[in-house]
Amino acid sequence: MLIKEYHILLPMSLDEYQVAQLYMIQKKSREESSGEGSGVEILANRPYTDGPGGNGQYTHKVYHVGSHIPGWFRALLPKAALQVEEESWNAYPYTRTRYTCPFVEKFSIEIETYYLPDGGQQPNVFNLSGAERRQRILDTIDIVRDAVAPGEYKAEEDPRLYRSVKTGRGPLADDWARTAAQTGPLMCAYKLCKVEFRYWGMQAKIEQFIHDVGLRRVMLRAHRQAWCWQDEWIELSMADIRALEEETARMLAQRMAKCNTGSEGPEAQTPGKPSTETQPGTRTAGTPDGPEAPPGPDASPDASFGKQWSSSSRSSYSSQHGGGVSPQSLSEWRMQNIARDSENSSEEEFFDAHEGFSDSDEVFPKEMTKWNSNDFIDAFASPTEVEGVPDPAIMATKGIEDEARAPRDSEGLDGTGDLGVEACSVHALFLILHSGSILDSGPGDTNSKQADVQTLSTAFEAVTRVHFPEALGHVALRLVPCPPICAAAYALVSNLSPYSHDGDSLSRSQDHIPLAALPLLATSSSRYQGAVATVIARTNQAYAAFLRSSEGTGFCGQVVLIGDGVGGILGFDALCHSASAGTGSRGSSRRGSMNNEMLSPEVGPVRDPLADGVEVLGRASPEPSALPAQRTSSDMANPDPDGSQNSLQVAPTVTSGEPRRASTASCPPASSEAPDGPTNAARLDFKVSGFFLFGSPLGLVLALRKTVMPALEVAQMRPACEQIYNLFHAADPCASRLEPLLAPKFQAIAPLAVPRYQKFPLGDGSSLLLADTLQTHSSLFLEELEMMVPSTPTSASGAFWKGNELGNEPAAQPAAPSTTSEVVKILDRWWGNKRIDYSLYCPEALTAFPTVTLPHLFHASYWESADVVAFILRQVIEKERPQLTECEEPSIYSPAFPREKWQRKRTQVKIRNVTSNHRASDTVVCEGRPQVLNGRFMYGPLDVVTLTGEKVDVYVMTQPLSGKWIHFGTEVTNSSGRLTFPVPSERALGIGVYPVRMVVRGDHTYAECCLTVVSRGTEAVVFSIDGSFTASVSIMGSDPKVRAGAVDVVRHWQDSGYLIVYVTGRPDMQKHRVVAWLSQHNFPHGVVSFCDGLTHDPLRQKAMFLQSLVQEVELNIVAGYGSPKDVAVYAALGLSPSQTYIVGRAVRKLQAQCQFLSDGYVAHLGQLEAGSHSHAPSGPPRAALAKSSYAVAAPVDFLRKQSQLLRSRGPSQVDLEGPGTPPTTLARGKTRSISLKLDSEE
């Protein structure tokens, strides 16, 4: 849902405005109703009493919007969905209006309005809650200074020019509001507009469109008309208005009755004639407040509306569905099955702090869109961009840092820090190469592209604010508009339809467009290389404009490219040309020597059929030289060296001074430069770290080039970037894979699934590294892959070292040449060290949609997808974290000790076919006292095997932010598998939290824990996990639910400066399960205590552990949370009843010993924030203890087995805690890393 509050000022009294408003409505309804497909029916218009606002007038209308919806979207909807109902309660000066659709049940528009005699200064006239105020966007509409769309401008409706004959008012100057505030009269319409369209892939785009065009644009024009029509209504009374309303209702009823007689509905749009109509929501929101503004003129709909949704031919329902299924029922089934998943969540899907929302709060504020409507409206009045001369103002889209200016770390950001601190707050710049859908037919609309980028920016801000606060304000997005290269191909293919000659034929609406052919035809055009050169130039312009801007001053972060379906193809070739020009991101001669024969495999001087449009259809036969099939393979391998007409048009190669890779000798050299193509100087002026493709058919294009030029090796077309990510939906007819082109055997390996954001906002623990995939699917590539894997301190399931080290590190055992050459060849051919193909979730119901509608739907879905945004942020933030230089200690990449033979021969036999279940206890030590680490090394889920007499290496991350592990020593396990390691006194650690990893020397499995060093008197809060957090009982089965608001309460105590201690009566063999549960729900980091093995008295062990904290560590426990069983434990610690909080029903005999939180954590949190505990603790400061999310992660294998890992952090937490200080790197739990880091890779 998108919420905006509009303030509309007019220089008139409230009584005058009431008459003006009602007169305007009936007049516009009369003028703009043309019948079927466009018009208004008034079903009821009667007074009411004791309703919204007291007594007023109730109106019930039906708007017919069929002719205002694009053909591709209309193909999804039945006729019933082409009507919008309006119910309005007008109790002036308060009105309330609601718009619904009889068919689209998850669509609604609600508008509340107060008309007050002021200048719009009241901050909260609707009495919104704190959460609603944070979601609300304020927007003031100025009837004089705000520009209207060029197609709607009329001089007689311009307040700057209008002067009333009867009243003498006008014209209005730009400072009219200030003058009216001093002299009067002046009134303001406060309008709170809530728009919701909760359907997959379309929500953000349609909600934004309705607000910024359907609501704001209509309200602006309607109020300009109300002012300029005052000579018509100034002498009317309310009785005259009611009479006009009744006359209008009768006239509209007669007009609609005539049109409904014998009408079959709006005519289907024909292929090849793109629609210029509006998207749904234009007339749906036609009257932004019932008695406010009816639909715009139907006779001449503004073309800019249609450009918001790229339109194509309408596809009727195919006969494959069978005659027994009606189009009406089929459409209903389609729309119901793509409703947002959040609406279909079962009770098993538990969200933190869900119960804390009021009826007016939104459960999903990540869908809220922050959007500058003034910029959008101004764009309508700006002239169309001249091809090749992009407007820098349009290209520069506002970054996330402008959307949410959260408080940041003061170090280096205020300009007063050390000189070595980076001055620019932006660490990652995203350049979006936006060309549009492959079915776009026009030259491309910059406003639509800008809206898509703004939607993506909003998604970035929402996801970052909740789960990546350390990136808030450090990411910027910029638009790079790309030429719509598929437009000519689409026009050509549309006219090749078997039914193109018969515009009235019903079969013409069938889906006869071969979607896969469009990018192939587009990239074969002689103008394609010119388009690539244009993209390179515009990208450099956008980058330079960012550097010149205030937010880009001093920028030295990473640059990431994002390309949509067509923009991805152009961006790939731009990167390939940059690599061939010697500016590859890795700077190697191998990368820099590639030429660009792949850019356009067509015959050079042949006339371009796509450029000529449909004129080629009149030819009897094409020229022989225009047929690429007539060129033999020998011609392609040995082109005419003198650059004759039969030579291939290719991009220029690098200069002769650069070495050429031997494997490229078979590729034809460039013999001539393509007209208007990239030149030697055309290259990107910056290094690209990553390139994300959104549903791009790049794989098909590369396959065509490989077919046309057999000598071309696709793997050698190395783009000048460090990594490519090919994101697509499995049901997308335009998408294709890339990995099988680089290594054919990858056709048998499924693409990696991008985790769902609702379940895994921080990733599901799956490794993205190519090396891990090669090891997992070793049977496809070689028989002895494990022989060449370098020795690493990792789990048995796979390595977490850098994937590109697999050919460079010495093997633990000698490998056969055939073994290593196959894997090294794959690693050498790969574009990066991670997987390339990634599959996104989409509803299964999309497979039943008409194929011609899918490109538009999928193209829109990427910009609002939280799955996509979270995936991108995980990759970019991982790269932004500190990296070591080559001169630093190499233990971060290479363990101090490789795998060795087991000390005991029986060990190999004992641990066969069992998985490790090692664990180490979290240790809390008072500063200055001995620091001792303890661990236990077992195998099997129930500790069936003990690791006895084996070496274990102890690593400690002494500087958690650096990710650098230091080897502290080696110990040998005893007969019970236990290990005790005293930290040497000369290496004793200071106050702080230090991750510890104990790695078994024999198989490199490991246990993890944290060593926490505190000062005397540190204050702490204790939470019993099973007693205070879980809302359901689960011993060994599915994950228990989290009590609503539990995470918020713990985070409040942590933010107040207290040490968090978690205790549980579960045995330590369940540590991985419990820790993974805490991590997935994003509980704040703390010390975790388990029972030592199975015990009949877990409460006694809890009490002993807490007593040791009080007596030995000298902690001061100020509060305890748990169940009624924990009351005695906390009482033994000396906690008073006011410090003991018990969750659940009150027990009468314990009421005097504790405080029962019968109303739940949400109410308790409000008391904490308003009470005495909201201040910082009185003990000594502990700035070194990081305020972060839970950091110790469970092994990968365990996380993968979880069937339902629920949403980790409710959005309400951010609303309650505010922007706050971003947590440190320790906030991201990690299961496996290329550098033994604990920060999340995926």
Swiss-Prot record:
Keywords: Calcium, Cytoplasm, Endoplasmic reticulum, Golgi apparatus, Lipid droplet, Membrane, Metal-binding, Methylation, Phosphoprotein, Protein transport, Transport. The modification Phosphoserine is found at residues 300, 304, 319, 326, 329, 342, 345-346, 373, 382, 593, 600, 621, 894, 1235. Residues 299-319, 581-593 have a biased composition (Low complexity). GO terms for molecular function: calcium ion binding; phosphatidic acid binding; phosphatidylcholine binding; phosphatidylcholine transporter activity; phosphatidylinositol binding; phosphatidylinositol transfer activity; receptor tyrosine kinase binding. GO terms for cellular component: cell body; cleavage furrow; cytoplasm; endoplasmic reticulum membrane; Golgi cisterna membrane; lipid droplet; midbody. It is a peripheral membrane protein. Residues 272-282, 643-656 have a biased composition (Polar residues). The modification Phosphothreonine is found at residues 59, 282, 287. InterPro entries: DDHD_dom, HAD-like_sf, HAD_sf, LNS2/PITP, PI_transfer, PI_transfer_N, START-like_dom_sf. Gene3D superfamilies: 3.30.530.20, HAD superfamily/HAD-like (3.40.50.1000). One of its GO terms (biological process) is phospholipid transport. Phosphorylated on multiple sites by CDK1 at the onset of mitosis. Phosphorylation facilitates dissociation from the Golgi complex and is required for interaction with PLK1. It comes from the Eukaryota. Signal peptide: none annotated. Pfam families: DDHD, IP_trans, LNS2_PITM1-3, PITM1-3. Residues 684-878 form the DDHD domain. Residues 259-330, 581-678, 1207-1242 are annotated as: Disordered. It is found in: Cytoplasm; Golgi apparatus, Golgi stack membrane; Endoplasmic reticulum membrane; Lipid droplet. The modification Omega-N-methylarginine is found at residue 1209. Transmembrane segments: none annotated. It catalyses: a 1,2-diacyl-sn-glycero-3-phospho-(1D-myo-inositol)(in) = a 1,2-diacyl-sn-glycero-3-phospho-(1D-myo-inositol)(out). Its main location: cytoplasm. Interacts with PIK4CA and VAPB. Interacts with PTK2B via its C-terminus. Interacts with RHOA. Has higher affinity for the inactive, GDP-bound form of RHOA. The CDK1-phosphorylated form interacts with PLK1. Belongs to the PtdIns transfer protein family. PI transfer class IIA subfamily. This is Membrane-associated phosphatidylinositol transfer protein 1. It comes from Rattus norvegicus. The gene is Pitpnm1.
